[in-house]
Amino acid sequence: MNVILLDKIANLGNLGDQVSVKAGYARNFLLPQGKAVVANAANTEVFEARRAELEAKLAAELATATERAEKLAALEAVVIASKAGDEGKLFGSIGNRDIADAVTAAGVELAKSEVRLPLGAIRATGEFEIDVQLHAEVKAVVKLSVVAED
């Protein structure tokens, strides 16, 4: 099925690209989320009329993400206190939501879906560098310090 992308989509294309995708991917994900429209003559004309508006929206989202990345870079280490054993092993773990809540409490709005923990949840005390994906083109790093609770 041929679709016109209304947003930048990783590993697929940019705004305005006409791409061929499997019908299920288009029907179940791209079309319902408003990330694409079916490629036909009428939709092509409508898209070309709205192209400037969509590009401005994407540029605004990128600017907002860049601004948030600068705020994250300016943050000192975010500290999370958690119950831990004698050898620094946590009772439980620290996941995406805990990190997002701590960063938000520190003054920069962050959603749990933006936090990237490729090795899974944190299960020990120490210093960590957490990757944050704010936008398809904007990444940031947050310094996280996990300390034992008294």
From Swiss-Prot:
Keyword field: Ribonucleoprotein, Ribosomal protein, RNA-binding, rRNA-binding
Q: What's a Gene Ontology MF term here?
A: rRNA binding
Q: Which domain of life is it from?
A: Bacteria
**InterPro entries for this protein:** Ribosomal_bL9, Ribosomal_bL9/RNase_H1_N, Ribosomal_bL9_bac/chp, Ribosomal_bL9_C, Ribosomal_bL9_C_sf, Ribosomal_bL9_N, Ribosomal_bL9_N_sf
Similarity comment: family membership: Belongs to the bacterial ribosomal protein bL9 family.
Residues spanning the signal sequence = none
GO annotations under biological process? translation
Q: What the protein does?
A: Binds to the 23S rRNA.
SUPFAM superfamilies recorded for this chain? L9 N-domain-like, Ribosomal protein L9 C-domain
Q: Which organism is it from?
A: Shewanella loihica (strain ATCC BAA-1088 / PV-4)
Q: Which GO terms describe its cellular component?
A: ribonucleoprotein complex; ribosome
**Which NCBIfam families would you find in this protein's record?**
L9
Q: What is this protein called?
A: Large ribosomal subunit protein bL9
